[in-house]
């Protein structure tokens, strides 16, 4: 069994109004050191699949559902879950 951590964020070329609003709020709270804020999504999937097919499966899920690849980038990390 594997735990897959998926991170989805807007591409650098796409305006992030939510990130801009958070940055503005932080500046109004005197956290002026913050130069940029980008908002994204984080998902954890538990998958029971052979490791041989796992990368193909995760890429397919990301590109078909979890990320809008027109405006979003994604990356993921895989860790094996050891049964106790």
Curated annotation (Swiss-Prot):
Subcellular location: Cytoplasm
Catalysed reactions, as listed in the record: N(2)-formyl-N(1)-(5-phospho-beta-D-ribosyl)glycinamide + L-glutamine + ATP + H2O = 2-formamido-N(1)-(5-O-phospho-beta-D-ribosyl)acetamidine + L-glutamate + ADP + phosphate + H(+)
Domain of life of the native organism: Bacteria
EC class of the enzyme, as a word: ligase
EC code(s) of this entry: 6.3.5.3
One Gene Ontology cellular component: cytoplasm
InterPro entries: PurS, PurS-like_sf
Alphabetical GO biological process terms: 'de novo' IMP biosynthetic process
Annotated metabolic or biological route of this protein: Purine metabolism; IMP biosynthesis via de novo pathway; 5-amino-1-(5-phospho-D-ribosyl)imidazole from N(2)-formyl-N(1)-(5-phospho-D-ribosyl)glycinamide: step 1/2
Pfam families in alphabetical order: PurS (PF02700)
Transmembrane segments: none
A molecular function (GO) term: phosphoribosylformylglycinamidine synthase activity
The entry's keywords: ATP-binding, Cytoplasm, Ligase, Nucleotide-binding, Purine biosynthesis
Disruption phenotype: Cells lacking this gene show a purine auxotrophic phenotype and an accumulation of FGAR due to defective FGAM synthetase activity.
Principal location: cytoplasm
Protein's job: Part of the phosphoribosylformylglycinamidine synthase complex involved in the purines biosynthetic pathway. Catalyzes the ATP-dependent conversion of formylglycinamide ribonucleotide (FGAR) and glutamine to yield formylglycinamidine ribonucleotide (FGAM) and glutamate. The FGAM synthase complex is composed of three subunits. PurQ produces an ammonia molecule by converting glutamine to glutamate. PurL transfers the ammonia molecule to FGAR to form FGAM in an ATP-dependent manner.
Record family assignment: Belongs to the PurS family.
Subunit annotation: Homodimer or homotetramer. Part of the FGAM synthase complex composed of 1 PurL, 1 PurQ and 2 PurS subunits.
Protein name: Phosphoribosylformylglycinamidine synthase subunit PurS
Lineage per the UniProt record: Bacteria, Bacillati, Bacillota, Bacilli, Bacillales
């Amino acid at each position: 069994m594997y735990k897959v951590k998926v991170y989805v964020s807007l591409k650098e070329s796409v305006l992030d109004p939510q990130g801009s609003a958070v940055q503005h709020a932080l500046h109004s709270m005197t956290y002026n050191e913050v130069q940029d804020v980008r908002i994204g999504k984080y998902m954890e999937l538990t998958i029971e699949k052979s490791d041989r097919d796992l990368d193909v499966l995760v890429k397919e899920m990301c590109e078909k559902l979890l990320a809008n690849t027109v405006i979003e980038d994604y990356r993921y990390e895989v860790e094996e879950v050891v049964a106790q």
